[in-house]
Amino acid sequence: SSKAQRFKDLKKVRPMAKRVVGLTGTPGNLMDLWAEIGILDMGQRLGRFIGGYRDRFFLPDKRNREIIFSYKPREGAEEKIYELISDISISMKAVDYLDMPECISNRVSVSMSESEQALYDRMADEMILEYGEGQDIDAVNAAALSNKLQQMANGAVYDESGNVRNIHDRKLDALEDLIESANGKPLLVAYWFKHDRERILKRFPARDINTKKDIDDWNVGKIPIALIHPASAGHGLNLQEGGSAIVWLSLTWSLELYQQLNARLYRQGQKHTVVIEHLVTDGTVDEDILRAIERKDNTQNAMIEAVKARIGGMADDGRSNDEGI
């Protein structure tokens, strides 16, 4: 990202390096390419400034008067960008070069009751649920609303005092079914919110994957239900020996974190078919998240677009035309 401190630090020392080889995952969108390619060629191909790159290859897409929420490529821009960077870039998929097992992706749908759905819909429409002083659940902007709705889809939500208010157990019921159908085979369960983890631990004999001992125990089959947060599932974390099934109890808008966690099991050395289960609450933001992941959309834009219409187009622009290589 052009806004990341890592990018700014690399930009300063890049002229000192005679040769640079960059390794990266799949960019979220074409806009993300500017920073990555810029570090390699110091702005020769896509321009020295993100504003110039944006003006050259993109048009405003979703906007509210002067505030631009997202951009779309100009006609022919995608092909032109790929042409410009083709001499210094190569795309390689592990499945094309390594002996990889089959990977199956499933959607496990759950439904809330009428009263639970009504509560969710009221939060989506009014951005607040009133329970009394210090107990209200409210959202001040699109990002906060998306966060609250995702929590409710999972089954619980924090109020304004930080207390957890339980909504339903639909996903936990579905997880129990998956555990039973696994017949003793280990499951790696991904969660996002702390209350997700707490509710899982309260109901199942699960264990966190945090330390080297946790990793070793998982890989020798000592942990039947392992909990992991996507942000902690970094590159180099090898879990493929301990199991081949992932359950996304809580989805993530981050395509990078999603792919990174799945790659802990779906990687070289995995001997079994990898099954990725996505628990999705029907009629909720879960469906928007899964769609965004499936089309490899820019996560921030997808999140804002999914809820923006409900709150009159409020969003933070937060962009600058002055960031350059």
Show which residues each predicted segment covers.
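Conserved helicase ATPase motor motifs in RecA-like P-loop NTPase domains
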Residues: 17-30, 38
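Conserved RecA-like P-loop NTPase helicase motor core
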Residues: 197, 205-296
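PAPS/PAP-binding and catalytic site of the sulfotransferase fold
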Residues: 29-41, 80-84, 121, 200
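Inter-lobe coupling linker of SF2 helicases/translocases
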Residues: 5-18, 25, 45-184, 276, ...
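Short, well-ordered alpha-helix to beta-strand connector turns
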Residues: 14-18, 37, 223, 242-243
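Conserved RecA-like ASCE P-loop NTPase motor core of nucleic-acid helicases/translocases
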Residues: 186-193
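Non-catalytic, charged low-complexity extensions flanking SF2 helicase motor domains
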Residues: 273-275, 279-325
